[in-house]
Regions:
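ABC ATPase "signature
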Residues: 212-213
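Helix-to-loop junction immediately C-terminal to a conserved catalytic motif
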Residues: 51
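Conserved ABC ATPase "signature" region
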Residues: 99, 103, 109-124
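Short, charged/small-residue-rich alpha-helical element at the C-terminal edge
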Residues: 217-285
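Catalytic Walker B motif of ABC-type/P-loop ATPase nucleotide-binding domains
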Residues: 153-157
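Conserved ABC transporter NBD signature motif
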Residues: 59-70, 74-75
Length: 285
């Protein structure tokens, strides 16, 4: 199966300082790829390069088997962007926000209703964005991204500042898109989120990829259990693997109002990240 996206030895610098150095990664159809890193590690720069918003200084970017030194219209049409809720128009309704992009991509109006229904905002089609909650805005951003049925969607910290219930809703949307064969490239600060959703992850540190691979393999490398512990209202504790399959079970518990709390191995995973950062610093000495 050909990769949707292939990045080889990508390089970018600002003021003669490398912010991305020898970046290599690939994404297959239906894959969820997670990019993690501390502030200033280059996550935003990388996603801006991959979406054609800024130029690279070196290396190759290949979409659908063709090298893209310049982004053609077919590449832009193949990608959906859900990067910043501030790009939504507060004074316009949900429907009007999507109508603008329907015109740009020459999409039938029926697709607007389909996209709103997909993200469970069909009853808010006439609601102004300024009246939406953070979770609803994020879902509208995803609706806009899928409007033209792209092959790959870029998400920038899609659950940042969201409560657990809204986070779960976004996770379900991401997994649903994956099941349809859509590739997802997402940045996140949440290690447990990356472990739960992603097929592969990369940790950026000091302008380079310090860790890359399957989340389970990384857990094994650092001797992590990667478990979820679900505390139910009846006092029962359910232990699950922290992966996409467990999302279905958790969704059922939430739907039945049974969950009191969810505990993950996030603190342990943060230790992994810190050890990677420390490793990078020791290599500089």
């Amino acid at each position: 199966m050909d990769n949707i996206l292939q990045v080889d030895h990508l390089y970018k610098s600002f003021d003669d300082k490398a912010v991305l150095n020898d970046i290599c990664l690939s994404i297959r159809p239906g894959e969820i790829f997670g990019l993690l890193g501390p502030s200033g590690s280059g996550k935003t720069t990388l996603i801006n390069i991959l979406t054609g918003q800024i130029k690279k200084d070196g290396g190759d970017i290949t979409y659908f088997g063709a090298n893209r030194n310049q982004f053609a219209s077919d590449v832009y049409r193949s990608m959906g962007l859900a990067l910043d809720v501030s790009s939504l128009y507060d004074r316009l309704t949900c429907y009007q926000n999507l109508s603008i992009y329907a015109e740009i991509f020459n999409v039938e109006k029926q697709r607007i209703l389909t996209a709103l229904e997909y993200v469970n905002l069909i009853n808010d089609a006439k609601t102004r964005v300024s009246k939406l909650s953070k979770g609803m805005r994020q879902r509208l951003l995803i609706a806009r991204a899928i409007l033209h049925e792209p092959k790959i969607i870029f998400l920038d910290e899609p659950t940042s500042d969201l409560d657990p219930l809204n986070t779960l809703e976004i996770h379900k949307l991401i997994l649903s898109l994956q099941q349809q064969g859509t590739a997802i490239f997402m940045t996140t600060h949440k290690m447990d989120e990356a472990m739960k959703l992603c097929n592969n992850i990369a940790l950026l540190n000091n302008s380079v990829i310090a860790e890359y691979g399957n989340p389970s393999e990384i857990c094994q490398k650092y001797n992590l259990e990667n478990k979820l512990r679900i505390v139910l209202h009846n006092g029962e504790i359910v232990e699950l693997n922290n992966d996409a399959e467990s999302m279905k079970i958790i969704s059922e518990y939430y739907a039945n109002g049974q969950i009191r709390a969810v505990h993950s191995s996030e603190s342990d995973l943060k230790e992994v990240f810190l050890s990677v950062v420390k490793k990078g610093k020791s290599n500089e000495i």
